[in-house]
């Protein structure tokens, strides 16, 4: 809303065949490590949370929102100039079809997505449930396809701990924290009980890292330094650096090299731009065969980029990465992370 010449170690997952006999690369299965699965009520809560805590996002990403929701950009911009809620109404007008889980899964299958980590939220829906509760109930029968990573707000440390415990008991498989929406520093010792509980429960934490547009909060919230502090203090905690800490990708990658529980996930950024000089992603590609090989996850953020997930995966394929790296980044590392977390939960 981020020494590479040595042999890479195996991540413990089977490597799919990604080069056909004719020399054409065949895309392996995709795991979307940063997905948003909401009905319209959930999307309204999501957009309102952005508007209340980081209204810049409704402006900066206006074209992306309109493209995703099929809304008129002109009508949206006109509404946003008057009242934020009117702009949300343009995106989510009455009469939109209800969320259809079967249709969602069918689309995921068409895009080659075999699993997704769906990010939740502790915000309340009109019916009184949290978004986390709705999501956990909605995907209860398809947890092999959709794993819920429950959203937490660190504004209330005790409340965050209670939400973690409730969500874990209901089947959550990870957690999601967005510091710039809370205005909190995750590395503050006040939150240590939350991270200790996450580690003990085998719940990886997706943490928004790197650049953000919320002018009311400092840019350092969720930096590589945050991840370094958390990983050093909570050695058993599994951390996913959402957006890979961009533009400080090299520092985040070096942090991951120091801490075996840290992973980088590059949602919101298009793979096709990564090789361009000045993109900030050069370190990831330079170290792809070494320290980055088993630490990078593919993600989308769902609404940010144009086009379907399969197209983004194809952009990754076009980078001409070694077959084993391409497979690891697209799904192998995410599957290995999920298996590692499951092993902790199993005791």
Language-model features and meaning:
Residues 1-31, 40-95, 102-106, 165, ...:
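Mid-to-C-terminal alpha-helical segments outside catalytic/metal-binding sites
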Residues 34, 135, 167, 198, ...:
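Conserved, mostly hydrophobic/aromatic
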Residues 34-42, 208, 243:
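Histidine-centered divalent metal-coordination motifs
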Residues 37-38, 211, 246, 304:
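Short active-site segment of divalent metal-dependent hydrolases/proteases
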Residues 62-156, 289:
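Metal-cofactor-binding active-site regions of metalloenzymes
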Residues 112-221:
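Active-site gating/metal-coordination segments in enzymes
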Residues 132, 157-160, 248-252, 306, ...:
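Short, well-ordered alpha-helical microsegments
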Residues 172-179, 183-297:
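Catalytic pocket-lining loop regions of alpha/beta-barrel enzymes
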